[in-house]
From Swiss-Prot:
Heme binds at residues 124, 128. The keyword Coiled coil does not apply. SUPFAM superfamilies: Heme chaperone CcmE. This is Cytochrome c-type biogenesis protein CcmE 2. Residues 1-8 are cytoplasmic. The chain crosses the membrane at residues 9-29. Pfam families: CcmE. It is found in: Cell inner membrane. One of its GO terms (molecular function) is heme binding. Heme chaperone required for the biogenesis of c-type cytochromes. Transiently binds heme delivered by CcmC and transfers the heme to apo-cytochromes in a process facilitated by CcmF and CcmH. Residues 30-151 are periplasmic.
């Protein structure tokens, strides 16, 4: 092999190794940032991974919200009208958070099948429903409750 050909081969191999490393790092970063959505039924059936960041969503069950008197801790149940999952959250709940409305919680599922959320997203108006929640409710054979007037 002449020196010119050898030099080209080394350059091509170096480029391939560099591209491979870049793709590997990108895939690794994306895999760590992907938060899959799970319904309360999927969580109750054991389909959601434990100790991995997930998104859980559904309708907040009426009468299930319990706030701590001396801290920002909140505990509530979310349902897809088939099964229910408990969510705990430490922080200020969004202004639009209400019982009977759709939410998506981001957090980790613990060993007791309780989602320990570090972020709670509430719908932003009476007509909006997070797409994942709307699909989960449709799949369960239910529809979202009609928006009522609150005053």
């Amino acid at each position: 092999m002449n020196p010119l050909r050898k030099k080209r081969l080394v350059i091509i191999l170096a480029i391939l190794v560099g591209v491979g490393a870049a793709v590997g790092l990108a895939l690794s970063a994306l895999q760590q940032n992907i938060n899959l959505f799970y319904t309360p039924t999927q969580i109750a059936n054991g389909e959601a991974p434990k100790d991995t960041r997930i998104r859980a969503g559904g309708m907040v069950e009426k009468g299930s919200l319990v706030r701590s008197g001396d801290s920002l801790d909140a505990k509530f149940n979310v349902t897809d009208f088939n099964k229910t999952v408990t969510i705990t959250y430490r922080g200020i709940l969004p202004d639009l958070f209400r019982e009977g409305q759709g939410i998506v919680a981001l957090g980790k599922l613990n060993a007791d099948d309780v989602v320990v959320a570090d972020e709670v997203l509430a719908k932003h108006d009476e007509k909006y429903m997070p797409p994942e929640v709307a699909k989960a409710l449709k799949d369960s054979g239910q529809s979202a409750p009609a928006p009522g007037k609150e005053g």
